[in-house]
């Protein structure tokens, strides 16, 4: 099972250093199934027993792109895993860069956690699967370092997870399109994680607020 934590705009380098130290000690040995996406200002240079990923990047090595992070910056911290397509990035106008980001990350051999998800209107109109398929049309579903995270927008940060029957329907559909690992994200917490992980085709979870405290994240990992 893959356990990924998206810390979003939380933690400083000082606090994430403590977070990483505790997680490293708990893990004991390197585990590629544990991924943490800290804010870029908190990236750590030291070796960790988990994969440190980037929440965002610009599809370039470097250049005249004010305020952006290029491959050169990720390389400095040994980062080879990126999050692409999160709905909070799409809402900020990231939609047009998604294909460019995916193609760049694939070209350079990054592990990619690619997020997809529908809003409540799309769900209620019965067009979820059609919508998700369209989101996936721009990427290579056979890329060997791809992970797909299904995060229904109506569940992100709301405290209300999607129903397990809905999750199962979506993951079964996605499994018919690709053989890569499939994650669920959207208000994952200690009360629902066991049920979510028991859904057929679920290969793990992408956790938000419930992973902000390392002790909580560890508890979710250990089950």
Curated annotation (Swiss-Prot):
This is Triosephosphate isomerase. It comes from the Bacteria. Its EC number is 5.3.1.1. Belongs to the triosephosphate isomerase family. Keywords: Cytoplasm, Gluconeogenesis, Glycolysis, Isomerase. It comes from Campylobacter jejuni subsp. jejuni serotype O:2 (strain ATCC 700819 / NCTC 11168). Substrate binds at residues 6-8, 157, 187. CDD domains: TIM. The gene is tpiA.
